[in-house]
Amino acid sequence: LGNVVTSQTWLKFGTPESILLLLYKRITGARELGFEDIPSLMDEYNELEKIFFGKIKIDNEAKLVKSRGLYEYVNLLNPPKQIPAQVSYRLLLELCKIFKEDRVSRINKKLIDYHAIKETSPEINKLIEMAGNFADEFDISDEIEIDIDSKVKGALSKLVILLEKDEEIEDLQNEIYQIAKGDDVEPKEFFKVLYQIILSTTRGPKIGPFILDIGKKNVGEKIGRYVK
């Protein structure tokens, strides 16, 4: 993988499949990729896996064939027979920033609370360990470009004000829902934008409890950067 990015070091933070995905992208002429790309490569692999097993429907036949072929390639033409338990790497990163002591068991408990997993497994434990290594080693703000219309921006601004208050919020999930409805924004669409801002993905755990877990002020600052 070159002088700076060695496969041995990479495997502290990401799976062998993510290395193969990296190599494929390099072969196809992508920009130079490094450790900072591990979160997006890990989550891209999850998406390829969902496409391969039919959990994500792709109408474009060419894209479907390409995605399925790429998934087989990164699994060395021997893909698993059924979809393994999955957790968003970026979700794990956010949790690893909070939980430093007894990390694996505490994050497993949160993942079960969020209904992200049904039970613990060695594979999930390994993912938590890798995400923990990444969170401890790098401080990378993984922001993506999001097209946000004025109505949604207005609702986001109100949410920022709410999150910046020092008082305890009893039912943040409902408060977020009411802010969206009050600004004539479809709650489902509002939640999707929040996941994009916080996790760079379109879905995630129940948003209210998750925001409280990773810190209201922290999330408020993140959202604030998108509504300026």
Predicted segments with their positions:
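Aromatic-anchored, charged helix-turn/loop surface patch used as a conserved interaction hotspot
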Residues: H115-E167
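Short coil/turn segments at secondary-structure boundaries
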Residues: L21-R26, G34-D37, D139-I144, E170-Y177, ...
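Catalytic adenosine-cofactor/nucleotide-binding cores of aminoacyl-tRNA synthetases and other
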Residues: L1-G132, L199-K228
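C-terminal accessory/binding modules appended to enzymatic or scaffolding proteins
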Residues: D147-L199
